[in-house]
Amino acid sequence: MVSFDRPVWAEIDLSAFRHNMRQIKSLLQPGTIFCPIIKADGYGHGAVPLAHEAVAMGAGYLGVAILDEAAALRAAGITLPILILGYTPPQAAAFVVSNHITQTIFSKEQADALSAAASNLGITVKVHVKVDTGMTRIGVRPEEAAAFCSYVAGLENVHLEGMFTHFASSDSADHAYCLEQFGRFTAAIAAVEASGIRLGIRHCANSAAILSLPEGHLDMVRAGIILYGLKPSDECPMPIDLRPVMRLKARLAMVKQVPPGVGVSYGSIYHTQKESSLATIPIGYADGYTRMLSRKAQVLLRGQRAPVVGRICMDQCMVDVSHVPQAAVGDEVLLFGGPDLPADEIAAHLGTINYEVVCMVGKRVPRVYVE
């Protein structure tokens, strides 16, 4: 199959990624395991290239959400321990075991399936028990943790390596609920260890907690959004310097002069008010530049902002460049990324978070890795 370079790309700055990793590690005590979270294709940045960078930078674990993500890393030659943070059906246990993947568990059915598969293969499988301290998602209740861990520890060919929880509001200025969750988790740890079980890796700190709850770092931290240079929230303190890793870019496909009163794009919801210069950008909602940004977003062209006019199409959108007379076909356009047009601005237009903005960038947008 012949593939041609699109005049649309997501520029991924590897030096920024490494810088962010160094900055985050500066907050940790010696011996704390650093676990980059590269689920959802590395938050849209490309899991495999960034996994290789993370390994080279001294990561001790990698975190993903689903089995397919772990499998892709193994297929790419990543040998570092990988923790699947989410649910994996018991029928996939043999694949988990044979690929030396660490699985999150919270039910006897999962644990039994992993034990059976590991016994059949003559391999010991590592597991981490998830404790639901207040996210109300997957996980055993804190008061169930000791009994469940005792059950798991008694299974053949299963190594109970760790236990963890996830904070629901560590990115909030009010840490009351986060501290309540942390208290429940530490109580669960104490109950488990009082039963004679030694938990090698206890972890609960996500990006926001890494920044604002040092007592929650424990044995391992899970760095997600901050690894990509984005803030967990506006309320979250930022004691380190982060650099955005992704910039979404394109090149102008056409520039045309349009008289007053002309409708633009589907539905003609926008009409030119005067003689205008309009440019077409070959990116649309199929690429993750969502239709919901129509008449809201701006792009950066030749150092100036240009508003999106009319509805964003599946593959193209239009901007008014009347105030940029030098605009020409082939000019580079920044759709988001960096300090001048941050992903947070796009998120604000959409009523969402920066996580979703970078994750929305579609598969047909090439990722171009730069230093």
From Swiss-Prot:
The keyword Isomerase applies. Its cofactor is pyridoxal 5'-phosphate. One of its GO terms (molecular function) is alanine racemase activity. The active site is at K39, Y266. It comes from the Bacteria. GO terms for biological process: D-alanine biosynthetic process; peptidoglycan biosynthetic process. Pathway: Amino-acid biosynthesis; D-alanine biosynthesis; D-alanine from L-alanine: step 1/1. Its EC number is 5.1.1.1. It catalyses: L-alanine = D-alanine. InterPro entries: Ala_racemase, Ala_racemase/Decarboxylase_C, Ala_racemase_C, Ala_racemase_N, PLP-binding_barrel. Keywords: Isomerase, Pyridoxal phosphate. Substrate binds at R137, M314. One of its GO terms (cellular component) is cytosol. The keyword Cytoplasm does not apply. The modification N6-(pyridoxal phosphate)lysine is found at K39. Catalyzes the interconversion of L-alanine and D-alanine. May also act on other amino acids. HAMAP family: Ala_racemase (MF_01201). Belongs to the alanine racemase family. This is Alanine racemase. The lineage of its organism: Bacteria, Pseudomonadati, Thermodesulfobacteriota, Desulfovibrionia, Desulfovibrionales.
